[in-house]
Every structure is written in C-alpha cells, then in structure tokens.
Amino acid sequence: MQEISLVSFSGVFALRDGVSEKEFLPRLHAFLQHFIDMGFATSYRVMRREALDGFGKTLPAFTYRGELVYPDLEREHAAYEYVKQHGEQVTSLHVAMNSMVKPDADFFLETRIA
C-alpha cells in the first residue's frame, strides 16, 4: 500500500475585536481556496478552539486554526515562494483576510510521519 505524503501549513489566530466569524469566514475561505485553485494545496479546514477544562494552559492564546494541506513539501515551498512574490491577487486576498485577524497570529508546518 502506497502512503500518501501530506504536509500541513497551519495558522493559529484570533479575530480582531468587533469582527464576527460570519464576516471573516468568506474572506478566509477565498484566501485558502486560492491555493487549491492555483494547484498548490489539495484541501483546507478551519477549526474553532473549544475549551478543555484543565488542559491547554501552556498553549498560546488563539481561537481558530486554519490548515492548508499540500501533497508534499515541494508544493508547500512553491506556494510560499508564490506568496513572497506579492502578486496582486494573492496579496489582495491576504490583506482582506489578515486585516480581520489580531497581529499575534502564529504559523507552523507539519509533515505526516505515520
């Protein structure tokens, strides 16, 4: 059985004061879908953090986690290079989404090992 290589780029974040999920999610979906449409990512998901009594005390403060799934590191690296070029479409989508997020967002990259 051939294993599928998966790479996940995730961001943990909170919305700026006064910004609702309802107004934010369409902008986030448009930004994440762009990476699929461009052929970099294969899927995405957006999760809302739920409190778990007695756990998570050492984690940074965040409300949401967005995850873009790539088939391999090469596609993830290509997507990162694409963003660094500051093209008009990706920059516009990023600014529209990012303007609603608190500035303390953080990001991490994971590769599936099992």
Predicted segments, located by residue:
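Alpha-helical interaction segments
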Residues: F13-L15, H34-F35, D53, M97-N98
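A generic structural signal for ordered secondary structure
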Residues: L15, L32, L68, V83, ...
